[in-house]
Amino acid sequence: LRCKMLHNRFAGDKLKYLDQLYEGHVEMNGQIVCCKGVNDGKELERTMDDLSKYLPFMRSVSVVPAGITKYRDNLYPLELFTKEEAGEIIDMIESRQKKYYEEYGLHFMHASDEWYITAGRDFPEEERYDGYIQLENGVGMMRLFITEFTEALEQVKSNPGYLKMREEVKRTVTIATGKLTYATICSFAERMMEAFPGLQIHVFAIRNDFFGETITVSGLITGQDLTAQIKEYQENSRKHFVEKISDAKKFVDNIGSADKNVHGLGEDLIIPCN
């Protein structure tokens, strides 16, 4: 399967490295990039079962959907996963987590946040993320955000000066985010506005023109898209809170994407950005 996906007859040899790392008791973490019709279904089950043999030195594996950009000329015709298919993959992963946890004290196999959003399901409780070991692969980011936001809001409300602050806060802000997390961010904006009636929050979903509209995560929003799309709102907002923008240096081989840092965006929009 690996040889087929990478169009390289030697690609399967790389799996031997896992054996060597396991034999040397070297701690590992892995990721499965799931491609519809290629390595999902029975192939995904087999891959998960094969990787579980490297426990306990393989500490975690994330399962993420392949990102499908608009730059796919002459490439395999990948498709996006449907709501039902995302639910099936979540079920497949969660059905194995209990077994792993009982034997090793780790949930081991983790579905990325994107699966839960696509399937319209609630995110797992915090304990299931094993200390957010796969956070940088998009696993548990939303649960961590929910936890931190809720704790911070409750802390503010319990402050003796809250009632005075509630009356004094008069501000309009815009939160820019990717389309994937738009609904979730909107729900938290509503909670903030309930806590502070004088606070007006506009949540703006940035369309990804650079990579294509099928890329909806916040981490791949480029500066050029953010600047172009948010300018029309700047007359209504004094300050914009930018959730996350891409840094050109994070791309393979330092390929640029006309990105700007947060201060550069502020100069373009003629407003402060954080």
Language model: regions and residue ranges:
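Hydrophobic, small-residue-rich alpha-helical packing segments that form membrane-like cores
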Residues: 1-11
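Short secondary-structure boundary/capping segments
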Residues: 8-9, 47, 76-81, 85, ...
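Conserved C-terminal portion of the radical SAM core fold
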Residues: 16-75, 84-114
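Short, surface-exposed amphipathic charged segments that create phosphate/polyanion-binding patches used
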Residues: 74-79, 123-130, 214-224
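Hard-cation-handling environments
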Residues: 80, 87-177, 195
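Redox- and metal-dependent alpha/beta enzyme cores, enriched for Fe-S-associated oxidoreductases
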Residues: 158-234
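Short hydrophobic beta-strand segments
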Residues: 170-182, 235, 243, 250-253, ...
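A short, acidic, amphipathic alpha-helical segment used as a generic capping/interface helix at domain edges
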Residues: 214-266
